[in-house]
A protein has these predicted regions:
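Class I S-adenosyl-L-methionine
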Residues: 1-146
Length: 146
């Protein structure tokens, strides 16, 4: 990992402890006028306080759909406390692993292109108009391993 990237990640990690983090994140998200927000393109939920803060940001940005992928299994017991506009998705840790029970929403990664439901590889690795990761009608999103 590049030193500049690592430094930025540590800065973000430290920032979640700041007392104004919820207010700042809420302002940033609401000011973008976006309808969809993905948490953590790198990293994961650090602890229960962090998860509670994310839930609060989602509550304070009710016009935005939040997608929160995680590999932190302990969060399962909190998934039913998530705000209505937040989809907490357990990402299966192994390639070709079936979706785990006990989760409202999951994501899997596989090597069989026929089982992949994510269209990004066919769209220049972009979501474009796909919103499956935010759509609560979709219980599992299957990504193609790359």
């Amino acid at each position: 990992m590049f030193k500049v990237v690592q430094a930025a990640q540590y800065k973000r990690l430290k920032a979640i402890r700041h007392p104004l983090w919820v207010k700042a994140m809420t302002m940033q998200i609401n000011s973008k006028k976006t309808k969809f927000f993905r948490w953590h393109d790198s990293g994961d939920i650090q602890d229960l306080k962090h998860l509670a803060k994310i839930f609060e940001v989602a509550r304070r940005s009710p016009d935005v759909q939040h997608w929160l992928p995680t590999r932190e299994a302990w969060t399962a017991k909190y998934q039913d406390r998530a705000p209505a506009n937040l989809k907490l998705i357990f990402s299966m840790p192994m390639v070709n692993q079936e979706a785990a029970g006990g989760w409202n929403y999951t994501s899997t990664v596989g090597t069989d292109p026929k089982k992949a439901t994510c269209p990004a590889p066919k769209q220049g690795n972009e979501c474009k108009s796909c919103r499956a990761c935010w759509d609560k009608k979709i219980k599992n999103v299957a990504y193609l391993a790359h």
